[in-house]
């Protein structure tokens, strides 16, 4: 009898320490574990920002992994709205939305969305985008139905299957087969928000929609820390974030200790009944170009006045002129410190910046 082959898998939903006060995964350790698990690549999807992108890509290269740069955005109806009426029951309804860059254009569009989230959509500590921006900056981007905090799963959780289906159609119209149905399986989500629906119930609805619209299903783990034993320190991080006490029974916490960076074997066991959802992560992987984010540092070219042969000599002249004005006679200690600082600036090629 032929031995059954274990499905392949790459993580497409990962939070690092750059998901501020929410993620606890060190990028270097995450890359090491991905390599040890013989994964071909890994995604970066921090909350609302791409602060870790350069470090992420550099570390992936060290371990011969493909870096898949993305972001889990905060999606709202109107990014400009900052006033909400309690009397009318209004609140800032933020949904999670996972996006990945397929190529250089996609990376540039993700960067634009991130920037506009802060510039135009910042409310409290949340950089927010809306569908108006997505209509403008969606080229080169892959999207998923995301986690239970996303708009489509939330519609399902609250019993509005028609809304969920219409949202799926909106994404398909926008992205075609670059939109994927994402399913997750975390313990402790058997009765979400006390509404009598479980994460698995949500998954089954999503799978039915995927079949109806011929969409690929991908399996993910909402990774926020590296290993299972990191759940406890991560819980402390959440307390710092929310101001809650570790002893408070009613504070915000994750549903279980399963939000870690699982190995391929652990994911295969969790999704043994739908192995194609694991293999489909490679379908996403194959679509994504390997990003090269290294580039020369762009610094101003400062015009050098006559009598100086380089920015180095002119900066040195100005520094010593200023030091004499400030200190009068220069001691050996001051001279040594000035030369030390000037050497660092020169070695880095930052003379034009300081001038």
Predicted regions and their residues:
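Phosphodiester-processing cores and adjacent nucleic acid-binding clamps
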Residues: 1-355
């Amino acid at each position: 009898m032929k031995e059954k082959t274990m499905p392949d898998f790459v993580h497409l939903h990962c939070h690092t320490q750059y998901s501020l006060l929410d993620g606890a995964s060190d990028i270097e350790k995450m890359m090491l574990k991905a390599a040890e698990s013989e994964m071909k690549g890994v995604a970066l999807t921090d909350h609302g920002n791409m602060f870790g992108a350069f470090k992420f890509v550099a570390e992936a290269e060290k371990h011969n992994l493909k870096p898949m740069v993305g972001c889990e955005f905060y999606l709202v109806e109107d990014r400009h709205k900052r006033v909400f009426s309690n009397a009318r029951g209004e609140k800032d309804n933020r949904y999670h939305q996972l996006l990945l860059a397929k190529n250089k254009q996609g990376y540039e569009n993700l960067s634009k969305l991130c920037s506009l989230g802060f510039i135009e959509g910042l409310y409290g500590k949340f950089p927010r985008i809306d569908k108006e921006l997505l209509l403008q900056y969606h080229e080169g981007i892959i999207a998923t139905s995301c986690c239970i905090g996303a708009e489509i799963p939330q519609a399902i959780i609250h019993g509005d299957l028609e809304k969920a289906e219409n949202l799926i159609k909106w994404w398909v119209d926008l992205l075609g087969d670059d939109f994927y149905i994402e399913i997750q399986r975390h313990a402790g989500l058997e009765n979400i928000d006390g509404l009598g629906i479980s994460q698995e119930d949500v998954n089954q609805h999503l799978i039915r929609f995927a079949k109806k619209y011929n969409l690929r299903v991908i399996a993910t783990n909402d990774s926020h820390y590296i290993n299972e034993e990191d759940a406890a320190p991560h819980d402390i991080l959440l307390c710092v974030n929310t101001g809650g006490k570790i002893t408070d029974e009613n504070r915000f916490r994750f549903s279980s200790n399963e939000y870690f960076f699982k190995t391929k074997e652990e994911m295969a066991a969790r999704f043994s009944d739908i192995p194609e959802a694991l293999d489909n992560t490679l379908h996403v992987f194959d679509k994504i170009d390997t990003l090269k984010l290294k580039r020369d540092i762009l610094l101003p070219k400062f015009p050098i006045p006559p009598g100086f042969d380089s920015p180095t000599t002119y900066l040195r002249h100005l520094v010593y002129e200023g030091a004499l004005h400030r200190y009068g006679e220069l001691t050996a200690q001051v001279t040594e410190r000035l030369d030390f600082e000037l050497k660092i600036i020169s070695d880095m090629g930052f003379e034009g910046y300081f001038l």
